[in-house]
Amino acid sequence: MKRIVLGIMLCLSLSVIAVYAQEKTETKPAPPVTNAEAAPKAGQVAPEFTLANDEGKQVSLKQFRGKWVVLYFYPKDFTSGCTLEARNFKRDSAHYEKANAVILGVSTDSVDSHKSFCEKEGLNFKLLADTDKKVSEMYGSKMEYNGNIYSARNTFLIGPDGKIAKVFMQVKPMTHSEEVLAAIAELSKK
């Protein structure tokens, strides 16, 4: 009888160990894959593009020559990090205006999604719909995650001359707006 009880206990112990080991080795989603190596560098002329904004109107980068352009790419409307980043740009918008800067947000979301996001958050700058993902790719901000394509969280500060003045890769939404404002202030001194 003791042997049977010991045998059962051994089997149960091995089963628990096997389940625990399986949980430990389950695969986690792969990290996002980006084409960041293709991103234009500081000093280069910013690649030109035209995209529809949150109102469905066509917006071209060249429209903003003579101004600083904060071209920020972000993954998805209505997500926590993207909402925080947009709110901080909105909060600081008077400082950007004073610095002769415009803010343009770009993601792979649709015009309708951008419109809803702008309305819900009361955004006072334009969001551009890169639905074919070509601009994200051109700026090294195309990201694949779990089989979907998004824009990676990168920002290109474009000078009034149309050249990229500074590149911010994989930014932190909480402090990014202040970081960009500081860069504009520093670069404006030169």
What are these regions (language model features)?
Residues 1-48, 190:
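N-terminal targeting signals for export/organelle localization
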Residues 40-43, 49-68:
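A short beta-strand-turn-helix
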Residues 55-56, 132, 161:
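Residue-level recognition of short loop/turn positions
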Residues 61-83:
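Short active-site neighborhood of thiol/selenol oxidoreductases, capturing the structured segment around
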Residues 83-123, 133-138:
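Structural microenvironment flanking redox-active thiols in thiol-disulfide oxidoreductases
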Residues 123-125, 142-145, 149-156:
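Structural micro-motif
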Residues 151-190:
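Thiol-/selenol-based redox modules, centered on thioredoxin-like
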